């Protein structure tokens, strides 16, 4: 493989990738509103000579290159979060701007930059005849990730393919182009969205003893939730902290993976109440909990932890603990209902699909993370090349739910995600496009031994019909 030719080709497309990314940034594309950016991506793929470009029923845009039966997929979510307070932005977040080195605007790092690199990385494969015999590339611009990570791939697996077994038999592995700060990422923590409902009885506020104040009871739950996140796991603690999963005593099978991924966390993210008036005792109170899960935790264990909090047991007859559902229509109007559960996943560093990216990076760019400038390198220097994300990605479904091998390498920085004045680096676009182009030829499926996955959370089995 001529790695210098790959680098030269990627550098030659630097201006095209930058223009393509600027065009995507200029089209507002929050979750469920991605139609405009989908059409822009479709047009770019068609211009570049993709063999087939299609839009599935959920609204994901899918480009194909090659004629083989085995699939290597590259995924980029093309929706973005909103801009938040416009006063926090130094320039128009959609009009954006560019310098010699950076591109500014919402979605640059998270993560339309990944779409630009993937689209052109596969074009380089075609230009240089790098697609191995028997393979084809599937480039996915996926929707609604910011709203419900992985739901787009649930739809792809179950509605585009004929279910998990069919998808697993056809897809060798998936590269996620989420930002990785120059690293190759082999997993991340999972998450779930938990709801706690507390029942009370209203009465006139002048005689509160006649009622049963749901807010007061929920206040005790809130303190317990804080304890669950902040406490250690000492025997003297009534509520043992989530840090316990880093200890082989509490997590004998997966404590090493948990230490790699980081401990689980929980925080109260929303609170709601009902009351007849401001002069009455509240008759209900509900909270949302953002729960991040590490290796060894399951959705059942996380729900039970909340149910077993002292305050929840104290008010057991008035408490309901549940998991949120997601059923928001996509930009096409299609609804794919699913639970707000996003499974943890990790690969072994020796897995052949991970090793293909490592080998490509070593051949193209060396053994260390690279970046265009001091700001980029501030989050890269000294970190291992192979690592993990802090946030969540579509990998929660690709590998977490369905066991399709997944690995990450993408332009930009995690710290830029959801932040005002978001930027990405043009050199990252080049770096990633070159690596994507090299990977298929360095993948050795004969090294698969069925043990790539270190940890993959079980499915819920919920009937959501």
Residue ranges, per PLM feature:
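Short glycine/proline-enriched loop/turn "hinge" motifs that connect secondary-structure elements
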Residues: 88, 130-131, 185-191, 278-282, ...
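Short, flexible, mixed-charge acidic loops at enzyme active sites
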Residues: 84-97, 189-193, 332-337
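Acidic/histidine-rich catalytic neighborhood of metal-dependent amide-processing enzymes
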Residues: 111-193, 258
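Short glycine-aspartate micro-motif
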Residues: 71-73, 103, 170-176, 193-195, ...
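Acidic/His- and Gly-rich active-site-bordering loop/insert found
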Residues: 2-104, 127-134, 413
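Metal-dependent amide/peptide-bond hydrolase catalytic core
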Residues: 5, 179, 195-465
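Buried hydrophobic packing segments
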Residues: 41, 115-125, 153-156, 218-221, ...
